[in-house]
């Protein structure tokens, strides 16, 4: 086991995010619920932080990137996105932070480029 030089931020979707998701054109979410999204939220590695305040500083400095990643995961068209600002971000997501991240496997971590989910491939 190794301690990493990263902290982690988990963004737990809330009701306003779910309402937006359901309002998207051609979205088919019959097999998905808000609880499903909350049970398996996206997690983002950020620079290592000594405390929660430092982690929040990192989150705020990367707010556009984090919020855009969450939105693009479901809708690639920014025309359907809300304004990206801290107020909407904190309404749409509960933020959970872990300042210490340990890497248990004894092998190199792999990285792959982000690819958004295609909700309706036939649309």
For the regions a language model picked out, list residue spans one by one.
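Extended, charge-biased low-complexity segments
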Residues: 1-50
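Amphipathic protein-protein interaction modules
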Residues: 47-114
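Eukaryote-specific, cytoplasm-facing alpha-helical/coiled-coil scaffolding segments in long proteins
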Residues: 113-121
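Short intrinsically disordered terminal tails
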Residues: 1, 122-123
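Short, flexible coil/linker elements and helix-boundary hinge sites characteristic
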Residues: 23-26, 67-68, 75, 120
């Amino acid at each position: 086991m190794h301690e990493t030089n990263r902290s982690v931020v988990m963004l737990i979707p809330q009701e306003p995010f779910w309402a937006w998701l359901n309002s998207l054109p051609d979205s088919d979410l019959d097999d998905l619920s808000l609880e499903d999204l909350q049970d398996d939220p996206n997690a983002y590695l950020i620079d290592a932080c000594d405390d929660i305040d430092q982690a929040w500083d990192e989150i705020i400095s990367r707010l556009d990137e984090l919020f855009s990643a969450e939105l693009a995961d479901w809708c690639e068209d920014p025309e359907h996105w809300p304004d990206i600002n801290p107020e909407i971000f904190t309404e749409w997501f509960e933020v959970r932070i872990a300042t210490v991240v340990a890497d248990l496997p004894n092998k190199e971590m792999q990285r792959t480029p982000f690819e958004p989910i295609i909700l309706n491939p036939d649309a």
